Regions:
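Non-transmembrane "mature" sequence context
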Residues: 1-150
C-alpha cells in the first residue's frame, strides 16, 4: 500500500471576525499572529463602514487617539497589538450579530449600537471592546437565538 495524499472534502468553518476585517485566514492561530503583528490602520475604517458608524466613533471604541491613528495610517504603520485585539473583538461580535439576524446587516448594526438593559445600559458595541465583554455579547446573542430572555 502506497502513501496517499489527503484531500479534504469540506472546508474549515470560517474564523469569526475574519470576513468583516477582510482577512483571508484559516485558523485562530493566524488571527493571533495578525493581532501580534498589528492590523493595518485602515482596518478601523473598514470596520466602521461595516457598522455604519463614523471612524471617530470606532477610534473611541478602540481607545486609539485620532493623532496616533492618522499618523499610523499616513506612515503605513500597523496598529498596536492591544488596539488590534480590540478591533478583532468588535469584528467577532459584529459577525455574531449578523449571523443572529440571518445576514441582515442593518438589523445587526441597529442591535449593536443601541443600549441594552442586560448590559447595564451600554451598547453591545461598547461592551464588546474587552475580551469578557465580547464573549458576553456573543453569549447574549446565542441565548437570544435559543429563546432565553436576557
Amino acid at each position: 500500500m502506497g502513501v496517499r495524499k489527503f484531500v479534504p472534502t469540506r472546508s474549515a468553518a470560517p474564523v469569526p471576525g475574519a470576513r468583516v476585517l477582510g482577512l483571508t485566514i484559516d485558523s485562530e492561530f493566524e488571527v493571533a499572529q495578525h493581532i501580534a503583528a498589528g492590523f493595518s490602520a485602515t482596518t478601523i475604517g473598514r470596520l466602521a463602514r461595516e457598522l455604519g458608524v463614523p471612524d471617530k466613533r470606532m477610534l473611541t471604541l478602540t481607545n486609539i487617539p485620532e493623532s496616533t491613528y492618522f499618523d499610523r495610517k499616513r506612515r503605513n504603520k500597523p496598529l498596536s497589538a492591544e488596539t488590534s485585539s480590540r478591533v478583532y473583538r468588535i469584528a467577532k461580535a459584529t459577525e455574531a450579530a449578523e449571523a443572529y439576524f440571518e445576514g441582515d446587516k442593518d438589523a445587526a448594526r441597529r442591535w449593536l449600537i443601541n443600549p441594552k438593559v442586560s448590559i447595564g445600559g451600554k451598547t453591545p458595541l461598547e461592551f464588546a471592546c474587552t475580551p469578557e465583554g465580547s464573549d458576553y455579547v456573543i453569549k447574549l446573542l446565542t441565548r437570544m437565538e435559543h429563546g432565553i430572555i436576557s
